[in-house]
Amino acid sequence: MKIFCDPLGDFVDLPQKPRRVVSLASGLTEALVHMGYGEAIVGLSSWCPNFTPLQVPVVGDYLSVKEEVLREVNPDLILITTGVQRGLARKLHREGWPVYVLPLPNSLHGIFENIMLLGALMDDLEAARALIRRWQQRFAELEAQAPVPRPRVYAEIWFGKHVRMAGGLTFIHDLIEVAGGQNIFGDVRKGYLSLDLAEVMRRAPQLFLVYSEPEYPIQAIDLLHERGWEMRPIQADISPAHNIIHDGPSMMQAAQWLHEQIRQALR
């Protein structure tokens, strides 16, 4: 069947119910597994094994594919996202691969919208709705336990050597709110902001949430000492239960962990 893919500006020809899926986005991969479609996945990105135990070939990374492996697994659907993956998506589409591009989510609602799109692509909207309901219920339970008043949280995200602050147009904002905190940049109409230490201090955070990756590890406690700040540190990392930048179902675990970290920091 032909489906219009807006990020590509073109129609893509996909089967009614895909049987051989390559997913190049870890959040989408994990969502498919939780929807009951792990057996349909025949290829992954190099980042996906952090979130799923599937024993299938690694077809590529976030920005490239191994063409010989892609030909071997012969997918009838390739899942990819916008942002920096858009160029790869267009290349695969030009080469005739059955690629569908989903938007990078700016919020929790965007994540749920992508899950519904996955359900539509797999011809199983009910599986998508069931996952969303479970996710919403867990988040509602956590948010009901939020401390009063909520502590002010500053989230600093290190993408390798590149540092950003989490604004209001991110699902990290939603994660902080669900876990019981208040994002100090939640009123800013942007996603990721350039580092502005003076503005951070003006907004007077109580908790310092830092995410970094093993290739360039950054410790919250070290930054506090370096900057002379006095606030409670919370250290996030790439493990599914502590990963605040991942948009798959293990966000439920990350929200529980962050909720517990916030509670402990307030004692």
Predicted segments with their positions:
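Extracytoplasmic substrate-binding proteins
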Residues: M1-F4, D10-L14, R20, G87-K161, ...
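A short, structured surface patch at a secondary-structure boundary
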Residues: K2-C5, R19-V73, L77-L88, I184
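Proline-aspartate-enriched helix->loop->beta-strand connector
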Residues: P18, S64-G83, W97, S194-E213
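Well-formed, non-transmembrane alpha-helical positions, independent of function
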Residues: A31, V69-E72, K91, L175, ...
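Short, structured coil segments at secondary-structure junctions
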Residues: Y37, L54-Q55, E95-W97, A179, ...
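Alpha-helical, coiled-coil/dimerization segments enriched in small aliphatic residues
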Residues: W47, M165-G191
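Short, charged, surface-exposed secondary-structure boundary motifs
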Residues: F51-P57, V69, H109-N114, Q219-A220, ...
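Short, aromatic/basic amphipathic alpha-helical patches
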Residues: L88-R94, I218-E230
